[in-house]
Amino acid sequence: MNIHEYQAKRLLHEYGAPVANGVAVYSVEQAEKWAKKLPGPLYVVKSQIHAGGRGKGNFKELDSDAKGGVRLAKSVEEVVANVKEMLGKTLVTKQTGPEGKQVNRLYIEDGANIERELYLSLLIDRTTGRVAFVVSTEGGMDIETVAAETPEKICTLSIDPAEGVTDADCVKLCDELNLSGNAREDGEKLFPILYKAFCEKDMSLLEINPLIVMDDGRLRVLDAKVSFDNNALFRHPDILGLRDISEEDPKEIEASKHDLAYIALDGMIGCMVNGAGLAMATMDIIKLYGAEPANFLDVGGGASKEKVTHAFKIITADPNVKGILVNIFGGIMRCDVIAEGVIAAVKEVGLKVPLVVRLEGTNVEQGKAIINDSGLNVISANDLDDAAQKIVAAVKGA
């Protein structure tokens, strides 16, 4: 689960991290009221959406030369003018896709005189099974670009869970970030704070980009992105209360209601598979044959006929889907049950796009017979390779 920047900063502030004074606003009147209470003279007006690249984004409703989703203002009047222009508009960034996201709230905070921009994040290091810091002196830009072009400028430090962040870890991180004086002192305090917040709140990602050194030598969290482990949210009702459903894909919300693991993608071939590994393999082979998957959808190991029907409804709700591939290995799940669900779903949704079904495992012959005897336009496949080729051919021939 993701939260907004202002929520992330509020959470980090509760742990003692240095963040600027700021307030989230939902109207022009609120913006004017609260901007007057900030010291100024420099303000930052930030669009609050669950996507990166806001500063370089553009608003659909504004001219192409208009400013992006993060703006500087040098007076309360400028703050108000920017809020009027940004609030309620659709911001398009490299992460939103061409449809963009509507800006329903803005975050107004004190500006800062920046000397240096750094990168810092915490995540789960899958290699060591530990929480790791990832730091770089190249802050304020896309870390993937840094990793691709100058990987030597990125340092990863895994933390021993039995000891936590030690003095030696702090020294290492400060050295990698070239911190000295007040900034080094702040860093030695900040690193344990961030680690504590990450672990106690069951985060999956804590990214600060940039972490800045100000002209007085002090550190400040200038931007913050936080994601939480969905499987641990039952332990954190306070965090669950921060969820903004309007920022989530409606199809993913609907899928979660039926215990379906669904992630929307940008392709045109819908996938319904049981098991995450098989789902990944299915998406890979679709790409191998020259097409793109429209989604990841794992129906799990004990899907019922009703669950399969819901899965079809979710897949077909995506207007980009031009064909569907069902790939099921029946272990716990029986192929005849899946076949019945597929037939029921095709009839209920009135499927208009090509459908390829590959079944293997428990009761596979019964499952194939159900599909073949249905009289519906369903293409049967013998194996995964055959299935991928058939759905790609069907979509490209449509």
Curated annotation (Swiss-Prot):
Per UniProt, residues of the ATP-grasp domain are: 9-254
Cofactor(s) needed, names only, are:
Mg(2+)
Name the SUPFAM superfamilies for this protein: Glutathione synthetase ATP-binding domain-like (SSF56059), Succinyl-CoA synthetase domains (SSF52210)
Class of the enzyme per the UniProt entry, highest EC level: ligase
Entry's EC annotation = 6.2.1.5
Which reaction(s) are listed as its catalytic activity?
A: succinate + ATP + CoA = succinyl-CoA + ADP + phosphate; GTP + succinate + CoA = succinyl-CoA + GDP + phosphate
> Per UniProt, where does Mg(2+) bind?
209, 223
Give the matching NCBIfam families: PRK00696.1 (NF001913), sucCoAbeta (TIGR01016)
Q: Tell me its family.
A: Belongs to the succinate/malate CoA ligase beta subunit family.
**PANTHER family on file:** SUCCINATE--COA LIGASE [GDP-FORMING] SUBUNIT BETA, MITOCHONDRIAL, SUCCINYL-COA SYNTHETASE BETA CHAIN
What's the protein name?
Succinate--CoA ligase [ADP-forming] subunit beta
Q: In the record, what lineage is assigned to the organism producing the protein?
A: Bacteria, Pseudomonadati, Pseudomonadota, Alphaproteobacteria, Hyphomicrobiales
* Primary gene name: sucC
